[in-house]
Amino acid sequence: MTRKYFGTDGIRGTVGQPPITPDFVLRLAHAVGRVLRRVESRPTVLIGKDTRISGYMLESALESGFNSAGVDVVLLGPLPTPGVAYLTRAQRASLGVVISASHNAYPDNGIKFFSAQGTKLSDEWELAVEAALEEPPVWVDSATLGKARRLDDAAGRYIEFCKSTFAHDLTLKGLKIVVDGAHGAAYHIAPKVFHELGAEVIAIGCAPDGLNINHEVGATHPEALITAVKANQADYGIALDGDADRLQMVDADGRLFNGDEVLFLMVSERLARGEKVPGTVGTLMTNMAVELALKSRGVEFVRAKVGDRYVLEELEKRGWLLGGEGSGHLLALDKHTTGDGLISALQVLQACVRSGKTIAQLLGDVVLFPQTLVNVRLKPGQDWKASEKLALETKAVEAELGDTGRLLIRASGTEPLLRVMVEARDARQAKACAERVADTVRS
């Protein structure tokens, strides 16, 4: 059954346009409340948000919808998505709700949910909510209405949780770190985490005004971080996105490290400590250099579909702990139930402090392969999968690339585009092969 409202990461859109309107969000919360009350007589839901101006409006709508269904609400205020996941589990709540559109600009917003265990919810649960949305509301009587209260120390509890994932025998003393909070949910949290572990912290992107979230700052705009690291002669730079589940890092030279490289470092740090890492999960877009480097160290590597929920599914299926995406969504399931930019950064810094090496030194000879991505607009009705010419060209390119390169062809989920990605040790070869395949699609 196809979902009508839920996407790969909750419900998202432009504020004021369906479904991100106050009336729909109220009905959504009421429907979720009814689903919760099928298994629990008096559920409690936690609600956190990022710093978008629309968060106030949507928070009020959610609160009203839940209360009208007989569900109690605990308001957390601005808090990173992984912080909501953690507190949902720690507070023994029935459900966690996040109001955020992650790395998008302020006109967008969204609603996503976490289970009582702090994990993403199943497709079946989302379908049950959508079915409840189609039914007329059933308002509870006045004596059964839910109540709302605030958890005043939500940020402090999450800060302590993040710090607890860093080795207790280590500190960040002597390090100067630039922290970019993307004017988002971690603006009042991220600087404190690193400062309380001993670092000298320079904060940028930590002055939200409701409209500037992700604007020319944060993980999707690392130029600001690179400039600040160089200007302040810092040792490291850490950039989060609007809801702080995504990470990009920079070293003292201004070199940017993406999620693929950070994943490799997280695995390597554990191997160096003598831990067993049977395997890790990346995505279809994970750089092949990382795959080869991990395999050379005896670590199995599996690719999931693009999206952190698919990485998580593969990890849980195989009983593994570490996975992630090049975009900076990283999972360490023995540290947290979901991707967490702050905890991922702490794992990298722990590796650097313990070894006395920089990120670049820890990566050693692992150099990402050049990637070429070409977007080809499809003609109306064009069935690229049935093209014999494309099948032959694909086979020829894959033969040319051999074991040190790869070709990935996938359709866009939102536009009539075919994405052709080629990865190879040689940038010119990658570009030439990608153009050959793209030209075949166009012909």
Curated annotation (Swiss-Prot):
Reaction catalysis annotation: alpha-D-glucosamine 1-phosphate = D-glucosamine 6-phosphate
Phylogenetic lineage: Bacteria, Pseudomonadati, Pseudomonadota, Betaproteobacteria, Burkholderiales
Signal sequence range: none
Keyword set, alphabetical order: Isomerase, Magnesium, Metal-binding, Phosphoprotein
Residues with Phosphoserine modification: 102
The protein's enzyme class: isomerase
PTM field: Activated by phosphorylation.
Cofactor: Mg(2+)
E.C. code: 5.4.2.10
Family (UniProt): Belongs to the phosphohexose mutase family.
InterPro entries noted in UniProt: A-D-PHexomutase_a/b/a-I, A-D-PHexomutase_a/b/a-I/II/III, A-D-PHexomutase_a/b/a-II, A-D-PHexomutase_a/b/a-III, A-D-PHexomutase_C, A-D-PHexomutase_C_sf, Alpha-D-phosphohexomutase_SF, GlmM_bact
Protein's UniProt name: Phosphoglucosamine mutase
One of the GO biological process terms: peptidoglycan biosynthetic process
Entry annotated with the keyword Repressor: no
Catalytic site: 102
Bridged cysteine pairs (disulfide): none
Entry function: Catalyzes the conversion of glucosamine-6-phosphate to glucosamine-1-phosphate.
GO-annotated molecular function: magnesium ion binding; phosphoglucosamine mutase activity; phosphomannomutase activity
GO cellular component, one term: cytosol
SUPFAM superfamilies reported for this sequence: Phosphoglucomutase, C-terminal domain, Phosphoglucomutase, first 3 domains
Binding positions (Mg(2+)): 102, 241, 243, 245
